[in-house]
Amino acid sequence: MNTQILILATSAFLCVRADKICLGRHAVSNGTKVDTLTEKGIEVVNATETVEQKNIPKICSKGKQTIDLGQCGLLGTTIGPPQCDQFLEFSANLIIERREGDDICYPGKFDNEETLRQILRKSGGIKKENMGFTYTGVRTNGETSACRRSRSSFYAEMKWLLSNTDNGVFPQMTKSYKNTKREPALIIWGIHHSGSTAEQTRLYGSGNKLITVWSSKYQQSFAPNPGPRPQINGQSGRIDFYWLMLDPNDTVTFSFNGAFIAPDRASFLRGKSLGIQSDAQLDNNCEGECYHIGGTIISNLPFQNINSRAIGKCPRYVKQKSLMLATGMKNVPENSTHKQLTHHMRKKRGLFGAIAGFIENGWEGLIDGWYGYRHQNAQGEGTAADYKSTQSAINQITGKLNRLIEKTNQQFELIDNEFNEIEKQIGNVINWTRDSIIEVWSYNAEFLVAVENQHTIDLTDSEMNKLYEKVRRQLRENAEEDGNGCFEIFHQCDNDCMASIRNNTYDHKKYRKEAIQNRIQIDAVKLSSGYKDIILWFSFGASCFLFLAIAMGLAFICIKNGNMRCTICI
């Protein structure tokens, strides 16, 4: 009877399951890997791509005043070759140059071409004003078959001045223009290099020719260089164009005695615009702010890996194809073993039997928040998210992407590589500088993202620790930590009690007496792992000693009774 009572009491004691509350974090089965300052490939619950790779192969022009120059080159709008007749004056905030576009008709070139192209791309369009030049003693209707309309003609905005008669004397002339506007005036003139000395004499008379141009900030003299050259558009001569920006109230003066291509109208810039050289099709159904030769980049990301020469409000170009920005906490998913044994463990060890600590693992079922609680008591088991700590972490992480964009986005200008021979060294420097900037920004981008990722992971761990400390301070001596993010509570804690722990309203004094009594009972029979090891070794040693003593005793008795004989041979 006494034995039966002892067995029942022992069984009841073993079946009692202590109330417990655990803290954990949200986890997913498959997270996203990010890099930090100290480690590569850390898995996080959420991450956002920061490098745009999707290109729209069209020029998105919705909401923009767009001009497609077609066969007209941008510089041609200032001098007026036949292909640019419809673009002599225009207004636009998006200027599209095509590869087929040409700036000239009579062969030649622009001095400092790329600088002028950049000015016009940002111009917002151009308007013109007549300069008021009149001429006597010369012809002003020079024309060429290279600039054909219905017949031979010339640049619409220029005057080709010739002697009144072939081989006739070209008089010395001086013409001045004062800019009375409030904005700078673009003044363009040309120097004609004849195909031969004989041709120059026929057009402008004999003798040396000299053209001098000056203003308050500019002075330059030009001498034509007649001579044979390869024919282009049927012409062996060349016209080189020069330009200056004339400040308000400043005056430009031209002094010449032949071989001078005179300006007819001054150009004024209208405002601001973007200019891009592209053969992509225009699309009025999409909007864009960032353009490149292959189309449009539409993105809110801070970086792009599409084109290093995109212009407008563009993400920074970087060499990396992907830079993941952590927007969630470090992910430690529940392992597959736990998933397979969940039901078995719950029966055998309770809800928490297969769950590692809040630092070592996460809970995939915690979907209402980033941090939360799981508990077990006499009323059952339950899970609840902690919204305050979740919101605190979210508030600090929200805006990380926007802050990266603010640090990296800027308006870019496109500088072409189409430099003439004189400008090639400058072009090489520009290209080297661009490549160096890309290298620097690629490194900076990786560093910025790594810093933000490090901060995010440290931040989310910090919030978890704060939550853990909050629970520990409430429970005090009423519970014991198990080292896995759980607290074993030494008193009965129903659902209301568990809720008070979560809500930070737990009154430890209310349960102190019961907790102390239960702690004493448990501590009386609890053996730590260190004591268990000592007892096991002691028990093993005692067993071995006892076995050896019994064996020696049996041998001694057998020898004494003559049942065993021991012979020693030397």
Swiss-Prot record:
This is Hemagglutinin. Keywords: Clathrin- and caveolin-independent endocytosis of virus by host, Clathrin-mediated endocytosis of virus by host, Disulfide bond, Fusion of virus membrane with host endosomal membrane, Fusion of virus membrane with host membrane, Glycoprotein, Hemagglutinin, Host cell membrane, Host membrane, Host-virus interaction, Lipoprotein, Membrane, Palmitate, Signal, Transmembrane, Transmembrane helix, Viral attachment to host cell, Viral envelope protein, Viral penetration into host cytoplasm, Virion, Virus endocytosis by host, Virus entry into host cell. One of its GO terms (molecular function) is host cell surface receptor binding. The record marks R349, G350 as: Cleavage. Belongs to the influenza viruses hemagglutinin family. The lineage of its organism: Viruses, Riboviria, Orthornavirae, Negarnaviricota, Polyploviricotina. It comes from the Viruses. Disulfide bonds join C22-C486, C60-C286, C72-C84, C105-C147, C290-C314, C493-C497. It holds the Pfam family Hemagglutinin. It is found in: Virion membrane; Host apical cell membrane. Major glycoprotein, comprises over 80% of the envelope proteins present in virus particle. Residues 555-570 are cytoplasmic.
